[in-house]
Amino acid sequence: MAKKDYYEILGVSRNASQEEIRQAYKQLIKKWHPDRNHQNRKEAEEKFKEIQEAYEVLSDPEKRAMYDRFGYVGDVPPNAGSGGGFGGFGGFGGFEDIFKDFGDFINNDIFNIFFGDQRTSSRQKQRRAKRGEDINITVDVPFEQVFTGTTIPIEYDRYEVCSHCNGEGVEPGSGWVSCPKCHGTGVVREERRTFLGVIVNQYTCNQCGGTGKIPGETCHVCGGSGRIRKRHRVEVKIPAGVDNGTVIRVQGKGNAGYNGGGYGDLYVNVRITGHIDFERRGNDLIKEIKIDYVEAILGTKVKIKMPDGRVKEVKIPSGVQDGENIYVYGEGVPDMRTGRRGDLILKIKVDIPKRVSRSEKKLLKEIAKLRGKDVDEEE
């Protein structure tokens, strides 16, 4: 399987700042959100998952550092099963091929001697305190609440610290004992004789993860992970002016960490449920208003029911033209950061009747004569 380039997925350079990565992520999830791509939803869902995966790695300094160094995050590189070998060090591919005919043992040992066991380093990290994973959730926010802001209760599943063992993964009272495989050293050393001589293979003990100790008895509640899955509820504040695709970070509300590591964060992706009477462009609101041709000539007043429930009376000046825009300043959506409101824009649509009554037609002909217009006299 080809290795994914997370920088390419987000469209940022390898030295991009966290803010640049965050901005790129926000733009891409807006573009590829499945609910905004009904015609190619399957492709959008795949893209959306790729974007989330890339952001999860590049937004975490520890994961990003590992990805930059090795080309992957986790114990096993993406192409480990395909014979690609040293995934993060393409320049050594030819050197690895020289030894591949000697068997897996010699091949692995040679690389361990010269470059160390990369997989070991990732295992050691897992035994140290590690921050919990972030959680992403999408919530629907009614368009009306964009004006005032709101607080939304959210329930979701997350991993929390096991209360029985206090996150240790060990049954209380049993403690830790010396690892029988590495005898408490955290390192396993093997010597093998080959036609090249004695080759020493040293690697981190995979039974204790390099700590030299194992649980005397594994916690029966969490199975040794130190975490248990629970239903969690949190109140999330949605600020006024929030837009579709906005991501709100709630610190410390993600999954519990490992071995005393802190909680990850909760990322709330906002999806605005539409309003059929208004169109939003930035912080401006646009609404089409139909008026009679007589109202267009003489001027009129219209009452607009705003999304927040208020009724706004707007004066339409005499002589307004079809397609003209009437601006009502400061009646749009509030800016999420400054609080300053956009404008309400009324697009005028003048309704010209196809048929009029006899009396109305007679009056119109009189007006036409006053204006010196030659009109059809036929009934």
Curated annotation (Swiss-Prot):
CXXCXGXG motif repeats: 162-169, 179-186, 205-212, 219-226
Cofactor binding mode and count: Binds 2 Zn(2+) ions per monomer.
Keywords assigned by UniProt, alphabetized: Chaperone, Cytoplasm, DNA replication, Metal-binding, Repeat, Stress response, Zinc, Zinc-finger
InterPro entries reported for this sequence: DnaJ, DnaJ_C, DnaJ_domain, DnaJ_domain_CS, HSP40/DnaJ_pept-bd, HSP_DnaJ_Cys-rich_dom, HSP_DnaJ_Cys-rich_dom_sf, J_dom_sf
Compartmental location: Cytoplasm
Domain J: 5-71
Zinc finger feature spans (CR-type): 149-231
BP GO terms, sorted: chaperone cofactor-dependent protein refolding; DNA replication; protein refolding; response to heat
GO MF term (any one): unfolded protein binding
Binding positions for Zn(2+) 1 per the UniProt entry: 162, 165, 219, 222
Intrachain disulfide bonds: none
Family: Belongs to the DnaJ family.
HAMAP family for this protein: DnaJ (MF_01152)
Role according to the record: Participates actively in the response to hyperosmotic and heat shock by preventing the aggregation of stress-denatured proteins and by disaggregating proteins, also in an autonomous, DnaK-independent fashion. Unfolded proteins bind initially to DnaJ; upon interaction with the DnaJ-bound protein, DnaK hydrolyzes its bound ATP, resulting in the formation of a stable complex. GrpE releases ADP from DnaK; ATP binding to DnaK triggers the release of the substrate protein, thus completing the reaction cycle.
PANTHER family for the chain: DNAJ HOMOLOG 1, MITOCHONDRIAL-RELATED
Domain notes: The J domain is necessary and sufficient to stimulate DnaK ATPase activity. Zinc center 1 plays an important role in the autonomous, DnaK-independent chaperone activity of DnaJ. Zinc center 2 is essential for interaction with DnaK and for DnaJ activity.
Subunit: Homodimer.
Protein name per UniProt: Chaperone protein DnaJ
Native organism taxonomy: Bacteria, Thermotogati, Thermotogota, Thermotogae, Thermotogales
